[in-house]
C-alpha cells in the first residue's frame, strides 16, 4: 500500500486514493467457470504480485476444455488477497507447489502417461484489455479498470515438434471446442477419424499403441486400401461394361451382336469339320499310293513291273501276268523299263505274229522299224523276245524269263 501511495502523482503521502472494492478482486464460489486470466507485462520495474501468482496457479489447474467443471471445494472463509498494485504490474511466476499439479482429465486415470502419436493443436484464450485514451496524463485520478474481452485463437501444430519426435513432449488429444476453428473439419477427415486414422492417413493413438512404443506407428487407412483395390479390380472384371464392350455392341446392339457371334461360331465349326474330312481323304490317298503295286512288284512312274526269276514258255508267262491283271511288256512299257532297269538278254515281250502279221497283245500293229529279223521264212517262230535290247522272233515253246507290266491302281 505504501508503494502504491508513493507511485501517485504529486508526491502526496497523505492523499487518499479511491480503491477498488474488495468483492471485485476476491474470486467467489459462484465464478469457477471464468477462464483464467493471464496478465501481460507492461513495465519491467514493477514488483511481483502475489495476487497474480494465485490467479496463474488457479489457471494452470483448469483444463482448457469446452466442458464446464464443478467448482472445486474451498474452505469456509475465503482468503482475501492483497490489493492490486495497479494495471501494468508484471506478476512473478509462481513457485512449484500443489496448485501446479495437473489435474486428471475426464476418463483418465491419475498418473497415466500420454498416448503416443497424440500431439494435436489446441486453443488459447488471450486476455485482451482495452485502455481508454481520454484520461489526462497528469491527472491524479486513477485510470478506470480496462474492459476485458476474451478471444479464442487457434494455435496450429508447432513445426519444431514432430508427432513422433519424443514421447516426453507429447500431449493428450483433446476434443475441440464448439467455437474453435480447429474443430471444423471436412467430412473426409471426420470419416478418417472414425475409421481409426487421422487426417494424414496415420493410425489413431488407440490403434498405434498396439505396436512397439519406440517405432513410429504409421499405417495406411483400410478404407483407402480397399478403394484402391476396388479401383484396380473394376477394369479387370469388366464391370464398367459401357467402356469395355466392343464397338460392335454400341453400333448394332447386344442381341444382334450375340446373334452374329453365334453365326461366327457355327461357321468356324463347319470349317473345322470340312478341314478334317479333307485331311482324312488326302491321308488315305497317300497311303494307297504307297501300296499301288502288289508285293514284289516295282513301281516306275505310273507302271508296276514284275521281274521273274524263273523261265517259262511264252504262253505260260502270259498266263501268269494275266492272273495279276497285267501283260507282257508292250512297246510303251519296253521303252520305259529298258531305260531304267537291266533286262535279261532273253525275256519274253508281248508281241506275237498272227494271220495279219506282227502286232502287240492289245491288237496294236508293230511299227515297221521294230519288225523282228529272220522271222519271215520260219513259220514256227511266232513269239517276240528281247535279246540285247533288240526285238527278235523266237520259238514260243522255248523257256525264257519274263516281265509283267501293268498300270497303277
Swiss-Prot record:
One of its GO terms (molecular function) is carbohydrate binding. Gene3D superfamilies: Mannose-Binding Protein A, subunit A. InterPro entries: C-type_lectin-like (IPR001304), C-type_lectin-like/link_sf (IPR016186), CTDL_fold (IPR016187), KLRG2 (IPR043318), NKR-like_CTLD (IPR033992). The chain crosses the membrane at residues 263-283. One of its GO terms (cellular component) is membrane. Residues 72-81 have a biased composition (Pro residues). The keyword DNA damage does not apply. Keywords: Disulfide bond, Lectin, Membrane, Phosphoprotein, Transmembrane, Transmembrane helix. Residues 300-405 form the C-type lectin domain. This is Killer cell lectin-like receptor subfamily G member 2. It comes from Homo sapiens.
Amino acid at each position: 500500500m505504501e508503494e502504491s501511495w508513493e507511485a501517485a502523482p504529486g508526491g502526496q503521502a497523505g492523499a487518499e486514493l479511491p480503491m477498488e472494492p474488495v468483492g471485485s478482486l476476491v474470486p467467489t464460489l459462484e465464478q469457477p467457470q471464468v477462464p483464467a486470466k493471464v496478465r501481460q507485462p507492461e513495465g519491467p520495474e514493477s514488483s511481483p504480485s502475489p495476487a497474480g501468482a494465485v490467479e496463474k496457479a488457479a489457471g494452470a489447474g483448469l483444463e482448457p476444455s469446452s466442458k464446464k467443471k464443478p467448482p472445486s471445494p474451498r474452505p469456509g472463509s475465503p482468503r482475501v488477497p492483497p490489493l492490486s498494485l495497479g494495471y501494468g504490474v508484471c506478476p512473478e511466476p509462481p513457485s512449484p507447489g500443489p496448485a501446479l499439479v495437473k489435474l486428471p482429465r475426464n476418463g483418465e486415470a491419475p498418473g497415466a502417461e500420454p498416448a503416443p502419436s497424440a500431439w494435436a493443436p489446441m486453443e488459447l484464450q488471450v486476455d485482451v484489455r482495452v485502455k481508454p485514451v481520454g484520461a489526462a496524463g497528469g491527472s491524479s485520478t486513477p485510470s478506470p479498470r480496462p474492459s476485458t474481452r476474451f478471444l479464442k485463437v487457434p494455435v496450429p501444430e508447432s513445426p519444431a515438434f514432430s508427432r513422433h519426435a519424443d514421447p516426453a513432449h507429447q500431449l493428450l488429444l483433446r476434443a475441440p471446442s464448439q467455437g474453435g476453428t480447429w474443430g471444423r473439419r471436412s467430412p473426409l477427415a471426420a470419416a478418417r477419424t472414425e475409421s481409426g486414422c487421422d487426417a494424414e492417413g496415420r493410425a489413431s493413438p488407440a490403434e498405434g499403441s498396439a505396436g512397439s512404443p519406440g517405432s513410429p506407428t504409421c499405417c495406411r487407412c483400410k478404407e483407402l486400401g480397399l478403394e484402391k483395390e476396388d479401383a484396380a479390380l473394376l477394369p479387370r472384371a469388366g464391370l464398367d461394361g459401357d467402356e469395355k464392350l466392343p464397338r460392335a455392341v454400341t453400333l448394332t446392339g447386344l442381341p444382334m451382336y450375340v446373334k452374329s457371334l453365334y453365326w461366327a461360331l457355327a461357321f468356324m465349326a463347319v470349317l473345322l469339320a470340312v478341314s478334317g474330312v479333307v485331311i482324312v481323304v488326302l491321308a488315305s490317298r497317300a497311303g494307297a499310293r504307297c501300296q499301288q503295286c502288289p508285293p514284289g512288284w516295282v513301281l516306275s512312274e505310273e507302271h508296276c513291273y514284275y521281274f521273274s526269276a524263273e523261265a517259262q514258255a511264252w504262253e505260260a508267262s502270259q498266263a501268269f501276268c494275266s492272273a495279276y491283271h497285267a501283260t507282257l511288256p508292250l512297246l510303251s512299257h519296253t521303252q520305259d523299263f529298258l531305260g531304267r532297269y537291266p533286262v535279261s538278254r532273253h525275256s519274253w515281250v508281248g508281241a506275237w505274229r498272227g494271220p495279219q502279221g506282227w502286232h502287240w497283245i492289245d491288237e496294236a500293229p508293230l511299227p515297221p522299224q521294230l519288225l523282228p529279223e529272220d522271222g519271215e521264212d520260219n513259220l514256227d517262230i511266232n513269239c517276240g523276245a528281247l535279246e540285247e535290247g533288240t526285238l527278235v522272233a523266237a520259238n514260243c515253246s522255248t523257256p525264257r524269263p519274263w516281265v509283267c507290266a501293268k498300270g497303277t491302281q
